[in-house]
Amino acid sequence: MMSEEASGTVMGNKERIVTLTLEMIYLLTGEHYIPRKKSDDGGALHAPGSVIQKENNKNDKKILELMSNIIQLLTGEEWGCLKTNTISHGETKKENPQQLYLPDCDYEDKADININLNATVCFDNESNTNVDKGANRWEARNVPKSEFLPEEQPCAANSIKEESELCKAEYRPDCSFNPLGKQIQGTDTPTANVGSSMNSSLSDNYLLKTIKEEPDSCEEEKLSDYKIITVSEPVAEDQNPAPSCSQNNRSLPNYVSNTIKEEPYDEEHFSDYRIITVTDPTQVAGTSPHSTENGEYDSSMAACTSQLSKSALNVMFNCNVCHTAFNNKSNLVRHQRIHTGEKPFSCSECGKCFRQSSQLFLHRRNHTGEKPFSCSECGKCFKWRSLLIKHHKTHTGDKSFTCADCGKCFKKFSRLTEHRKCHTGEEPFVCSECGKSFAQSPQLDLHMRIHTGEKPFSCSDCGKCFTQRADLNVHRRTHTGEKPFTCSVCGKGFTRRTQLNIHNRIHTGENTFTCPECGKCFTQHSHLLAHQKGHMGKKPFCCSECGKRFRQSTQLYLHQKAHAGEKPFTCAECGQWFKLYSILVEHQKCHTGEKPFSCSECGKCFKRHTLLTEHQRIHTGENTFSCSVCGKCFTRHSHLTAHEKIH
């Protein structure tokens, strides 16, 4: 009779523990599960109820009370430390680890079972533990830490025995050992599966759960994951197999996930309900994820973890032609078009093909004329950003590239490279027609147009053609009247920079070109050549109308206008016509009374510079023109001509 009452009490306690456990799971996950007995086909199903929204920080006290009742039913003793929220059980039991003798068991070999309150160890008589990677995360703040220790060793005493030393690192059948050391809840990490050599019946399993309070500063992500699995069919051992390594004939502990397994309820097999929690040891400061309980480093575990991380991460895509690695498959596809020559993007206007859509997008600007990049200084627009950057250097005057030989600076490195050939004398580009060499390829291309007679650039106003675009741009200034180069002294404008440089010699008095016959100096080389023809008596330019010869082509051009009677330049004041524009300018000074040329000796002013030069000979006494008959000298050539008529 007493045995039946005791048996009924035990089964009542078991049913009470199951009820309290499921209620605690409901508070943690918000899911309600109802246990069922095994059906005829051996399957067990759970009927989830309505899922409610979890409320953070409100169920902690209720969970503590439920766990205290469960432990009281298991051990027959009430744990007072669970009633406080300030001291975690792991901290109070850390210095004095206790041993647990579970009730209603026969303790045969009297071996002590050590409990590490900071570890999580799962005992199972199966060789492998299923890894559930899909554990649902429950996000409740300050929920107490759960550590479950299912004991498989039969025991007789219903008491807790304190022991002075911890379990050793070896895997003893009478000792629960966690090689991962201290752990923090909330992540999926490996948990040791120890005690597989214990042959006790599954019905003798009991559940011990310790509670550890987390401070208020705990974040939601640090809390454990829970999930209920209905074990209706045998779980294949090769599902999600855990990697194993061997070192010193010791196997790596199996990996398990943060799951709660729900197995069919039986009156004789209460321990079919097994709760397993796994925490992450890597989040504890000062601990290693591959260290054992006594602080030793487990190299076998580290090697397997490293191998897993390399296979799961670092996924690279390699080109099978040049073996270039890419971290994105789309980049590999674009790269392989270089080897295959594929150009899938074609322009609808001209049919030109491109490897990338971005290249086609930029190409379309040639047809649309779009210039989205504008200069903030002058407002000039460009199609490409690179052209805008180069243009900005014209405003800033930036010349980053300097020649090491002469110190000349350039805006582009290509210009510096071309300039260096002047110092080295290198002229690798040779004309096949005449053998002339050039330092740059564009110079050779321009030179070849002399032989071919090609003039691709034509003026839209007069139709005149030119071999270079620069010559065409200069020519257009004659139609527009643009003179961008201005003298800083007198303000006179010129269409070319070379003309401005020659004009500046008038103000500086520089006469670079000197006649070797008479010593006369000239500011331009063309003037010196024309002067030297006077000494030689050479007059190569002949008029086809009257046969008169001239030393310069400009003189012949003006003479031919006299035969044609052409006088294109007209004075707006008096209507007089002139052959040359320069003569018209001098004539207009008669109407304005302007005499810009003054004598520095007497202050007399003249309309022309030639008149001032003749006047200055009076002060200097210079008589340049002398009579060949009597030797009389004159300051003007006209006076000498009149004198010669006397003889």
Swiss-Prot record:
GO terms for molecular function: DNA-binding transcription factor activity, RNA polymerase II-specific; RNA polymerase II cis-regulatory region sequence-specific DNA binding; zinc ion binding. GO terms for biological process: regulation of transcription by RNA polymerase II. A zinc finger (C2H2-type) spans 317-339, 345-367, 373-395, 401-423, 429-451, 457-479, 485-507, 513-535, 541-563, 569-591, 597-619, 625-647. Keywords: DNA-binding, Metal-binding, Nucleus, Repeat, Transcription, Transcription regulation, Zinc, Zinc-finger. GO terms for cellular component: nucleus. Its main location: nucleus. InterPro entries: C2H2-ZF_domain-containing (IPR050636), Znf_C2H2_sf (IPR036236), Znf_C2H2_type (IPR013087). It is found in: Nucleus. It comes from the Eukaryota. Coiled coil: none annotated. SMART domains: ZnF_C2H2 (SM00355). Belongs to the krueppel C2H2-type zinc-finger protein family. May be involved in transcriptional regulation. This is Gastrula zinc finger protein XlCGF48.2. It comes from Xenopus laevis (African clawed frog).
